[in-house]
Structure formats: structure tokens, C-alpha cells
UniProtKB/Swiss-Prot annotation:
This is Protein ApaG. Signal peptide: none annotated. The lineage of its organism: Bacteria, Pseudomonadati, Pseudomonadota, Gammaproteobacteria, Alteromonadales. Residues 2-126 form the ApaG domain. Disulfide bonds: none annotated.
Amino acid sequence: MSALDTSIRVEVKTEYIEQQSSPEDEKYLFSYTITIINLGEQAAKLETRHWIITDANGNTSEVQGAGVVGETPTIPPNTAYQYTSGTLLDTPLGIMHGTYGMVSESGERFEAIIKPFRLATPGLLH
């Protein structure tokens, strides 16, 4: 792990979108707001994303692609980039984690880790 690997901090807030979910059809929509904070000394560009999404039944799906929400943002030192996206699960509980493929101002490629976070309907967990 290089110093660049730890220069990016990822914070996550999740929300269950009840009005667009259909529990009777086993469809649970969640939004997640991601804040990517550049704690390093160089600007860093987010080029790719890789998500691993697991529902309560153990079913796993992967999402890979360029950028996030149609953007490949460059995050200057000591600033943050925030976006909101969503995912649909077949269960009221799930977990997501993954990585962002980043490139530093000097051209060094590295991965920013997105630690596992929970998606859960209100009242499901205490």
C-alpha cells in the first residue's frame, strides 16, 4: 500500500427510499451519498468504480465502469467530491463495498478503498 492509497477517505450515508420500493415484490431501493475526501498533497482523478453488492440471501452482483454518475472528477488536495446514486435489492438488508480507480496528478495509479457499508430498511436492525 502506497501513501496514495491512504490519501483518499470515502464516507457513506445511506437512505431507504420507501416510496419507490415494493416489499411485496421483494424490491427495496436504497440511495447512498458518497463523499470522497482528498487528504493528499496532489490532485487525484477518479477514473473507475468497482462495487460488490450482496443482499441478505448472499446473492452478489458486481458493478464496474468509468467514473461515477457520468463524471470522472478531479479532486484537488484538501477538498471533497460528493455524489448520490442508488441500488435496488431483493431483500431489506444488504452490504456494499468496493474501490475507486484513481490516478494522481503525477500519473501514479492507485485504488481508493470503499469499506463495507450496510443498506437496511428502518427498524430492521437495532
